[in-house]
Amino acid sequence: MPWIQLKLNTTGANAEDLSDALMEAGAVSITFQDTHDTPVFEPLPGETRLWGDTDVIGLFDAETDMKEVVAILENHPLLGAGFAHKIEQLEDKDWEREWMDNFHPMRFGERLWICPSWRDVPDENAVNVMLDPGLAFGTGTHPTTSLCLQWLDSLDLTGKTVIDFGCGSGILAIAALKLGAAKAIGIDIDPQAIQASRDNAERNGVSDRLELYLPKDQPEEMKADVVVANILAGPLRELAPLISVLPVSGGLLGLSGILASQAESVCEAYADSFALDPVVEKEEWCRITGRKN
C-alpha cells in the first residue's frame, strides 16, 4: 500500500520528543536519519544515539489527512505555527521486501561469509554464519564489525577459547566457533543481546560451545586464548584493567568500536599489558590488536 512521510529537522536532543509527537499525531513508524552523514558511535545496548542535526521521519497511512496532522504538530512547543517540514507521497511497493533486499551475503577475509537466512549461501565450502538483522547490534555491515571479522578470519582458532566482550548479536563469538574455536564466551550488559546471541548460536549449530553471561554472572578468573571487544572507545579505556587480564599469557586481543581519532588514547590504556600491532583503519574507524605480554 502507498504511504505518506513527513520529515522534520531538529537537534539530537529534541529528536525523541518530536518522535513521540509524530506517533501521537498518527504515524505508524518513525525513522531517524543523519542530516549530514556524520560518523557516530554505535549505540550502547538499549540506547538510541542521535546526531547533532537529525531528520525525524514519520510514516503515515495514505488515507491520513496530513493537514490535520500538521495542525496537531503546530501545537507542540518545539514546533509552533508554520514549522518547517516536508511531506512526500511514497510509491507503492513491498517495503518488507525492499528492506530484505538491502541485505546480501558478505565476505570477510579468505574463508568467512555472513549470510541472511533468506539468501542462498554463495559458497557451500566456505565458513558460513547465518545471521539476520535483529534487536542486538552486529550483522557485519558496520566497519567495526567487519574489522573484527576479518581479524578472526586471519587467525588459527583451532581448539582455542575466545571471549566476545560486548557480544551483541553474538556474531563474533559464533564466527570464531565456525572458524574452529573449541569454545566461545559471550558477555553483554543487555539481556536482549544475550537472548539474540543464544538464538543465533542455535541457528548456526554452535550453541553447545557458546557460554553467555551478563557481567554480574561471569565466572571469576575467566581466561581465553583470544579476546575481542567491539564496543566503544570510552568503555574500552575505562574497562582496560578488566579486559587486559582476560587473555592468557601470549594470548591475542582485538579491539574495535573506535574512531581513528581515538586510537592513540585506547592504545595507551593497553600498552603496558600488550605488544600492540599497527592500527588498522576502515572508513574512519579502526581496529587495535596485540599479544599479551
Curated annotation (Swiss-Prot):
The gene is prmA. It catalyses: L-lysyl-[protein] + 3 S-adenosyl-L-methionine = N(6),N(6),N(6)-trimethyl-L-lysyl-[protein] + 3 S-adenosyl-L-homocysteine + 3 H(+). It is an enzyme of class 2 (transferase). GO terms for biological process: methylation. Its main location: cytoplasm. S-adenosyl-L-methionine binds at residues 145, 166, 188, 230. One of its GO terms (cellular component) is cytosol. InterPro entries: Ribosomal_L11_MeTrfase_PrmA, Ribosomal_PrmA_MeTrfase, SAM-dependent_MTases_sf. This is Ribosomal protein L11 methyltransferase. Its EC number is 2.1.1.-. Transmembrane segments: none annotated. Methylates ribosomal protein L11. It is found in: Cytoplasm. Keywords: Cytoplasm, Methyltransferase, S-adenosyl-L-methionine, Transferase. GO terms for molecular function: protein-lysine N-methyltransferase activity. Belongs to the methyltransferase superfamily. PrmA family.
